[in-house]
């Protein structure tokens, strides 16, 4: 399923659509359908041009982040409640040990800073850092931001679905331990849902929340987003001139919407 999601995501992406259009145009030209090839080629160029413009970020990117703004501004860490743990989703840091001993901060590295801010503000002591190679890539920056290593737990996962399932298993185990009495028999009584502050990029939060609602229903999730990249970029205006950064943002946004819609259909 992991690789199927990757393939489908590429095929419906702006770049995937552009490649498909180009291939169809070439095939039509080779078959002698030159007029049709020109039309398809022109539409493909227009398609890619559109997705490379900042104006499309307003259409597909900004709506992903809007509900997480408070009066049009990024919420302060002081506004979030105290919780049992901070769940820091992966995808913001990376490391290639064959190349360097130091991790690279990607565009979503604000997530790590947000988790550290929440920790230092006393919102939760435990930080669960997820992702592929989270210890190697993320621990160093968390420690630089003042989070003690003893407060950090790591969960290897390749995508958001695996992160939600893994965090759910961690808390199922914790709840079981809490409700065991001295004889090792599970005691009866009301089970209180553990509360976590979910930290990820604002544009990713809608889909992440859906995954946690499905795969970790025993957890109360409070969204604590960082990295409002779409909203920040959209502040630059409604330009229709193409640029590579807009193509990147819009491709990310389309990927998120495909995941959200796909989840709704599969649910």
Residue ranges and their predicted role:
Residues 1-29:
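Membrane-embedded alpha-helical segments of integral membrane proteins
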Residues 39-54:
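Hydrophobic membrane-insertion alpha-helices, especially the h-region
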Residues 244-267:
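Structured C-terminal subdomain patch of bacterial secreted/periplasmic proteins
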Residues 3-8, 56, 60-64, 254-261:
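Hydrophobic alpha-helical segments of integral membrane proteins
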Residues 50-246:
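A structural signal for short, hydrophobic/glycine-enriched beta-strand patches
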Residues 23-24, 49, 261:
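Hydrophobic residues within the alpha-helical transmembrane core of Major Facilitator Superfamily
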Residues 29-37:
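Membrane-interface helix-boundary motifs at transmembrane edges
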